[in-house]
Amino acid sequence: EFKAKENAENSTHVTSGKDGSFSIELAADVYEVTISADGYVDETFEFEMEKDKNYSGEQFTISPELAAGSARIVLEWNAQPQDLDSYLWGNTDKGDDLYVNFRKRTCEGRDGLLAELDVDDTNGYGPETITLNDLNGVYTYSVVDYRTTGTLQQYGATVKVYLPGKSAPTVITLDPNAGVENVWEVFELDHGELKILNRAPAEENLRPGSK
């Protein structure tokens, strides 16, 4: 659904194909775009349609419904920096060490798969998604600019955190005053309770390795 903010008569809706692709004609306006699909969490985005302009390849990313006792972390960004990486680490109540990033995309515990990174996107935009299967622990999530361009603060990034019992994700956008260079400390998750950090680390001790 495309809900126009400036002129309600411009509002409309479209049904995508099975692959999620769609084509639509829109009047110039600012739209609140709500995406719905069976088995997925409803998501809302803002999209500005400029007069006499065509758009191709615009993407609206939605997330599957959560399994019980799990969480999902989705990292999205723009064309620059090209290669951002997700880092999740911590400890479960049962004593398992959890560490997931592009070098170690899955982490097993004594009861099975603790967490998994779906893909390592190296050409901009993302999304990169980590699924966490055990909320009984304390975990930290950070984003690292693999190429250490020092432009993460300039171009920004967004993290969406999906938690059980929540109808919509918590959206965390990089604070423009955080002073981030190449590492962004995003949040801590303590037994399912989200604590937003949104800051630069005291020391940039998350150093990327080779890919």
Positions of predicted regions on the chain:
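Hydrophobic beta-strand segments
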Residues: 1-6, 33, 86, 157-159
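A short, solvent-exposed beta-strand micro-motif common in secreted/extracellular proteins
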Residues: 28-39, 139-145
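Short, flexible loop/turn segments at beta-strand junctions in immunoglobulin-like
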Residues: 23-26, 132-134
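Edge beta-strands of extracellular beta-sandwich domains
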Residues: 41-49
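Short, acidic Ser/Thr/Gly-rich low-complexity loop/linker segments typical of extracellular
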Residues: 3-25
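Intrinsic-disorder/low-complexity signal
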Residues: 51-211
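A short, amphipathic beta-strand motif
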Residues: 1, 20, 71-75
